[in-house]
């Protein structure tokens, strides 16, 4: 906006982003490319209101983001909610690789038992390097912020951060399969 000669304080921009980012994320979900069937699932930590909260994330074997969810607790219920949401969006995976997290293990076994399916569970920290490295893109943006004040604003801003990260990775389904830059993909969502 400053390039066009319009000077705006940072607080209205922050308020606009809190309103617009959830809508942008919803529009992106409708146009997201399908992901692979071998997922890597992990959680990372984000500081909200001086306390650590848990950002569940999953990527496929190629490094494409499957889904993300910010929760207050790293328990079985939160991991299962994340997993069911990812399955509803992308279908059942064949394999899920996790670290030694007990909550993730319990959630996957619970989904296997309830849905009468057999998702192969692998616990290998070296295969999980893809998702660990993918956390860096989110941390690169959130660490300079020095944490969030409120949980609801953290959820909304992380939706925007993750959406922009997935757009940069090229996961938006483009019309006519034409090659588009990240800025062109963003404009196609926004307008």
Where are these regions (language model features)?
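Residue-level recognition of single "structural anchor" positions
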Residues: 1-191
């Amino acid at each position: 906006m400053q390039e066009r000669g319009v000077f705006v304080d940072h607080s209205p921009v922050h308020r606009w982003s809190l309103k617009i980012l959830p809508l942008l994320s919803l529009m992106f979900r409708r146009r997201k490319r399908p992901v692979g069937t071998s997922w890597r699932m992990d959680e990372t930590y984000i500081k909200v209101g001086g306390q650590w909260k848990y950002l569940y994330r999953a990527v496929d074997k190629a490094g494409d983001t499957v889904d993300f969810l910010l929760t207050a607790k790293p328990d079985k219920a939160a991991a299962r909610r994340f997993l069911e949401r990812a399955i509803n969006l992308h279908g059942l995976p064949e394999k899920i690789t996790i670290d030694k997290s007990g909550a993730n293990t319990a959630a996957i076994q619970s989904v296997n038992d309830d849905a009468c399916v057999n998702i192969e569970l692998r616990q290998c920290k070296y295969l999980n390097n893809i998702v660990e490295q993918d956390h860096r893109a989110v941390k690169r943006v959130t660490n300079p912020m020095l944490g969030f004040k409120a949980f609801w604003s953290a959820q909304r801003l992380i939706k925007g951060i993750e959406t922009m990260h997935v757009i940069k990775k090229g996961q938006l389904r483009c019309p006519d399969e034409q090659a588009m830059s990240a800025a062109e993909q963003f404009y196609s969502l926004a307008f």
